[in-house]
Amino acid sequence: MSLKFLTPTGVQSAASGTVERWSQDAYVALLLRVGLGVVFVIGGWSKLSQLLDPARSDAIVALYTGPTGYINTFFLEYLFGVGSWLSPWGFLTTLSTFEFISGVALLAGFMVRPLALFYGFLLWTFVFSLPVVLTPGVAVAEKTYLAPALLVQIRDITLSGLMFILFNLGSGAYSLDARLMGSAVKRPTANWEHLGLLLRLSLAATLLVGGFFAGMANIKTFGMPALLMIAAGVAMLVDHRAARVASGVLIAMLLIYILGKISFEKSLIGNLNAVKREFALLAAGLVLAIRGGGELYTVPSIMNRAREALAVSRRQLAAHPLRFRVTVPAMILLLA
């Protein structure tokens, strides 16, 4: 005899809803793992192919440690200054090897939580270490970054947010971790209202920075109109239905941008490296379209809760007017 007939209907319904959420979160984890894993596989492969080629290794080291690279003077001296055993080539080769291997691990779903937590913080170091010149009146002899590092690297901040979402979700059912560790990682139980908010904030950050600062130096706009980016970013923050529409706009923008970056003069890895971050953004856009961004932290929901709280306060005032008359003056005296 089936046990479901012995289970109260409400419990059956709740269990069914929980199983559905587990299934959805498993697909969300898979999409994020693939999108983020591709970024690091491509990035690691691209750098290693140059670092391990004697004819090209000096050029890429000079690129990464130069004025248009990713390491400013402060960190160059810290990492490779007097007394340091590190060399720029050795540092970049080690980092690129780890980048490639960790990308493969994310794709396979192996050690996902530790990697996601590590990268969630590491991606912020690309902001701290970026060489920028922002002092008014200073003549810049060589081409470098002329915008605040946080704005230049806003896509990496978005990727950091995605990593923290993945850390909370775990590997998901479709992963090597699930095969090795069993049910402990097959059923993510994270609160999607919170993670959906982080997803919307992360994606909106890239869109709003691109929209509001379009035309300024080193700002990524994907070649899209500023007003379109602003509208999509605001929509993601305001309402859960509007966020889903905005996710469709983001996906279309990214696909157009990726296709437009294809060049037959570049190698396959060169083409992929030019749009590697966009693959993660594309995966996040798909997650938002499929799973949504939650309803709790949206403007309509917040306004409804505020109205309900105000209505409760009014009812309490009507029921206990004397208590209110005594309490409010006492509070005023305490604050005076």
Model regions and ranges:
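Extended, low-polarity transmembrane helix blocks
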Residues: S2-I101, A108-A232, L237-A336
